[in-house]
Amino acid sequence: DCRNSVVREETGSEIKNNEKIREDSPCLVKIPLFLGGFKKRSRYMKEYQNISHGFGPVYNRESRILILGSFPSVKSREQAFFYGHPRNRFWKVLAAVLKEDEPETVEEKKEMLLRRGVAVYDVIEQCSIIGSSDSSIKDVVPANLGIIVEASQIRKVYTNGKTAGKLYRKYQDKELNLPMEELPSTSPANAAYSLEKLTEIWSRAIVEV
């Protein structure tokens, strides 16, 4: 019976009922690492990678506020746009603040931001990071936010979460010299804040739009 016979190509371990299977056994089934995925993901999530931001800010001449995250998550880097994780509540919260329908596509998100005077980017342009872990960030190269501010009407900065706020104060505050308010993170990792609570706090803070 070959039903329980499996080998993982990346480890070379062959097990059937706790016994070794010969390499030439007809029961041997090889599962490549890129299909199994577990060890590859584990290594990826545990290793530092030095990564550039990968996509540009959203703003125009009419932008009045700037919302900053820390650095794009893995999902955002894959989609080449902000807050790409399906459980991140940024777009739900911002749409509620602006009294807009929640945008679904990247183009709809851009259109809403530009029409409502909201610029979005991140504090960091390049860094070493493990996966999406803000706490692992090191080797920081700050983003050139001055370009955004000079080409717009931005008068206030909001940071999405404590890490973004901390990084902003360390790398950007003196350069931009704008009022900044730190808002609770919309990340799914911030489980202490419900969608309703986030929306309430963000709505009280953001009045310029």
PLM regions: where:
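C-terminal capping/extension of enzyme domains
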Residues: 45-64, 86, 133-146, 169-209
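Short hydrophobic targeting helices and cationic amphipathic motifs
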Residues: 25-28, 35
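Internal catalytic-core helix/loop-beta-alpha segment
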Residues: 115-163
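Short, Lys/Arg-enriched N-terminal segments with co-localized hydrophobic residues
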Residues: 33-44
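Short alpha-helix boundary/capping segments
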Residues: 12-24
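Short, hydrophobic/glycine-enriched beta-strand segments
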Residues: 64-70
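Residue-level detector of structural "landmarks"
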Residues: 3, 7-9
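Short, surface-exposed acidic-centric catalytic microdomains
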Residues: 75-136
